[in-house]
Every structure is written in structure tokens, then in C-alpha cells.
A protein has these predicted regions:
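Asp-box/WD-like beta-propeller blade repeats and closely related beta-sheet repeat scaffolds
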Residues: 144-167, 172-214
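Blade-level signature of beta-propeller repeat domains, shared across WD40, Kelch, NHL, RCC1
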Residues: 416-442
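Bacterial N-terminal signal peptides
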Residues: 8-18
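Beta-propeller domain segments
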Residues: 25-67, 102-130, 206-208, 226-232, ...
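Short loop/turn segments immediately following the C-termini of beta-strands
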Residues: 90, 98-100, 173-175, 181, ...
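Surface loop/turn motifs at the tips and blade-to-blade linkers of beta-strand repeat domains
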Residues: 76-78, 149-155, 195-203, 256-260, ...
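Conserved beta-propeller blade signature
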Residues: 92-94, 167-170, 219-223, 275-279, ...
């Protein structure tokens, strides 16, 4: 090993250790949440704040804590980085087992190497992606008789899944593929057909691609994240990214439905208003309390700021050159979910049979922070809706993902409502699918 390499490695280690050992700050404030958040002033530093919860999966009988009136149980353990969930009409549960794909041009230099160390510390990228969808068939509805089948394999970092008629669509990191499905199938043996290409490439900074169908089954909507933290790779690298695509199923044509959304991940329809809601993971390195992640009803043709501004028209001067005309167009989102919470999973309560106050609203899977001194997220929350709009502050549904030492025993991501009306939670550090149901004893 050369002297320069040794010096670089030593500097890298020092930066990482200094960053992850920073002291505590005030806890996340209520002002970071809700329809009218109070935004803190931006803070910048040479070394970004890194306070990463070390991945240490659940041991023994340990499990998350469910809210009063509910209980948590195991649907399946021993999965390989389960990220996303989809429930078929017959009640079968599909789990996308997926992790970061190779991205040779992403996160280069010392900063990039630190980011990769952070990801591994947090439990991502420690092994090749499983690249498969697993089917869970819960025969008794209690998780005591669960069959497990490899439903579809040979994929490429899959996340989004949706069934339209007898066609099953999967959003890989670089394309949507489709296969035929028959009710009751436990394994798809035919080779998936490529339906439409998605932005991938050697940077592919935000690699997950989420997917939902329109209620009439004529359109697909795809969440495509940005190719950077805050535009540092140039605006050309963001072409058709930081956006929700609309795809016409019949023709295969697509358009950008809404953009300026840094990393739109969860997608869910709000039936009362008919609006498509999205959960958005916002940018880093502007301070512990800025900017908040959010969920919003996306409007056709709307622009939400990225990379020029955040939370409406708050200018991010790191983006050069700036574009005042685009900033002027930027609209503020509907509901703040807290800074650096990594609010990824999104699920409408639908036919949920959980007790009040978890009846009419959105469930949000908060994967957890790495870029603030006091950790935020690492929980599933519920936001009540009234007349199609979110009201009040989030309510914790499932917590306890951090142990007493601050290690991450699990990290919640994808969410779904099962056929029994319980909430399913994918935990990609605990390698478990959890079920939150009403507690009959309360």
C-alpha cells in the first residue's frame, strides 16, 4: 500500500469516526412536523453531521413496541433485506428483497467513501442484493402457518410491485418489467418482459423505483429519485429524475407528471379526494433540523423545488447556477414529516381494522436518520386525515427499533394493509416482516 493510500485511508477513518461520535442536540421539535412547519435556518459545516445507528438485528424474542390498543407479531423472519410490500387480491403477501445495485460513479472521493462506510454501518450494501420477490401465504392469518416461496427471481434491485388485471409489473432500478400472473400462483417461471426503461446508469444515486397503478388500471405512476444530494452532479444528470412519471399502459408512453421531488418513494391514493400522495426524502447537510421530509398530494405539472429550493421557495444556494424562474414556480408540500426521518413507506389506511385513532389516514414508514445529532425516525407513524387533508401531528404506531445503546435492531420501510385489515411493515435491518393488528384484550 502506497503512502498516499495509507494517508487517504487514515483521513477517511478519522473523518468517519469524528462524524459518528458527535455529541447530542435537542430532540426533534414538533415544529418540524405538520401542515405548517417552522423551518430552521440552514447550517453548513466542512464535515457533515453523521450520527449513524449501527445495524444490530433483533436478538432472541426482541421486537418493536406497538401503540396502545394494538399488538405486533411476526409474519416472517430471516428474509434478505426486505424493502417493499404488496398484497395480492387473494391475500398473498409479496416482499421485495432488494439492496443497493452497483453504482461505480456514485459517491466518489473522500466524501463518497464516507457515505459508503455509513451505508454499511447502517446495514445496507453489506452483501449483494437478493434481487427477488418472495411470496408469503399466511394460512391462519396469525403468522403461525406461513408458507414461503420464491415468487420471482433474477431481478435488478426491485422495489415497486403492482398487479393490473392478469399482468404483474415490477419496478427494477433501471426498468419496469412485466409477467403474466394467475390467482394462486406461488412462483413465476417465465422470463419477465421489459416494459419501459427507467433512469439508472453509473451514478444512480437514488436507486429505488416505486410503483402504483391508477384506480382505473390505465396508468402506472413511478417514483424516480434524484441523481445527487443537492444537484452537485449537474442539472443534466437529473434528466427525468426527482419526479413522478405517468405511464400509459396501453401505449407504453410516459411523461413527467410532477417533478422537483428529491426522492419520491412511497405512493398512495387518497380515495376521498382522488389525489395521489407521495412521501419525499429531502436533502442533507443543511443542519439537524432542515429540511423536513414530507408527504404531499402531487399536482399534474407541478414543480416542488429540487434542486434549486426546498419546502417551496427556500433557496438552496449550493445549487449553481441558480434558476430564479424555477424557484418562483416551486410550490410548498402539504405536510412535513420531520428532518432526516427518511420517510419512505406510505400506505393509506384503507380497510384497516386497527382501533381509533388509526382509521382514516396515512401510515408512514420512517427508515431513520443519519445526518443529525439526535436521531429521528426509526418508527412507523400515522397521520390522520379529515376531508382529504392531513390534520394534527403524527402518532407513533410502531417504535422501539433502536435499543438502549442506540443501535438499530431494525429499520421500517415498506408498508401495506393485509387482507385481515392489519398493517404490514418491512424491516430491512431486522430482515423481518411485522404485522400490527388490533389487540383483542384492550
Amino acid at each position: 500500500m502506497s503512502l498516499s493510500t495509507k494517508l487517504c485511508c487514515g483521513l477517511l477513518t478519522a473523518v468517519f469516526l469524528a462524524a459518528v461520535s458527535r455529541g447530542a442536540d435537542d430532540s426533534p421539535a414538533a415544529s418540524e412536523y405538520g401542515p405548517s412547519p417552522v423551518l430552521a435556518p440552514p447550517e453548513k459545516s466542512l464535515i457533515p453531521t453523521l450520527h449513524v445507528a449501527k445495524a444490530k438485528p433483533w436478538e432472541g424474542d426482541a421486537m418493536p413496541h406497538a401503540a396502545r390498543g394494538t399488538r405486533v407479531s411476526v409474519v416472517a423472519r430471516g428474509l434478505r433485506h426486505p424493502r417493499w410490500l404488496y398484497v395480492l387480491p387473494n391475500g398473498d403477501i409479496l416482499v421485495a428483497e432488494s439492496d443497493t445495485p452497483p453504482k461505480p460513479d456514485d459517491a466518489r472521493g473522500i466524501r463518497g467513501k464516507v457515505q459508503k462506510l455509513v451505508q454499511k454501518h447502517a446495514g445496507s450494501g453489506t452483501q449483494p442484493s437478493a434481487n427477488q420477490i418472495t411470496l408469503l401465504r399466511d394460512r391462519d392469518g396469525r403468522g403461525e402457518q406461513v408458507e414461503r416461496h420464491v415468487f420471482l427471481s433474477g431481478l435488478n434491485s426491485p422495489i415497486g410491485m403492482v398487479l393490473v388485471g392478469d399482468t404483474f409489473y415490477v419496478a427494477n432500478t433501471d426498468a419496469i418489467v412485466k409477467v403474466r400472473y394467475k390467482t394462486g400462483d406461488t412462483q413465476i417461471r417465465e422470463e419477465p418482459i421489459r416494459f419501459i426503461a427507467l433512469p439508472g446508469g453509473p451514478i444512480n444515486h437514488h436507486w429505488t423505483k416505486s410503483l402504483v397503478a391508477s384506480p382505473d388500471g390505465k396508468k402506472l405512476y413511478v417514483g424516480v429519485g434524484s441523481n445527487s444530494n443537492a444537484g452537485e452532479n449537474g442539472i443534466d444528470a437529473e434528466k427525468e429524475r426527482n419526479a413522478v412519471w405517468e405511464i400509459d399502459i396501453a401505449s407504453g408512453s410516459h411523461r413527467v407528471f410532477a417533478n422537483g421531488l428529491r426522492n419520491p418513494v412511497g405512493l398512495a391514493w387518497q380515495p376521498e379526494s382522488g389525489a395521489l400522495w407521495v412521501s419525499v426524502n429531502e436533502r442533507d447537510e443543511l443542519g439537524d433540523h432542515l429540511p423536513p421530509d414530507y408527504m404531499t398530494a402531487i399536482r399534474e405539472g407541478a414543480f416542488y423545488g429540487f434542486p434549486y429550493s426546498y419546502y417551496g421557495q427556500h433557496v438552496d444556494d449550493r445549487m449553481k447556477p441558480q434558476n430564479p424562474a424555477m424557484v418562483e414556480k416551486a410550490i410548498a408540500p402539504d405536510y412535513a414529516l420531520g428532518a432526516h426521518t427518511a420517510s419512505l413507506g406510505l400506505c393509506w389506511s384503507g380497510n384497516s381494522k386497527l382501533p381509533a385513532p388509526f382509521r382514516s389516514g396515512m401510515f408512514v414508514g420512517q427508515h431513520g436518520s443519519w445526518n443529525r445529532r439526535t436521531r429521528s425516525g426509526y418508527k412507523v407513524v400515522f397521520v390522520a386525515f379529515d376531508h382529504g387533508q392531513p390534520r394534527g401531528l403524527p402518532i407513533e404506531v410502531l417504535g422501539g427499533f433502536l435499543n438502549d445503546k442506540g443501535d438499530a435492531q431494525g429499520r421500517p420501510v415498506g408498508l401495506a394493509i393485509d387482507k385481515q385489515g392489519s398493517l404490514l411493515v418491512a424491516d430491512d435491518v431486522g430482515n423481518t416482516v411485522w404485522r400490527v393488528s388490533a389487540d383483542p384484550n384492550q
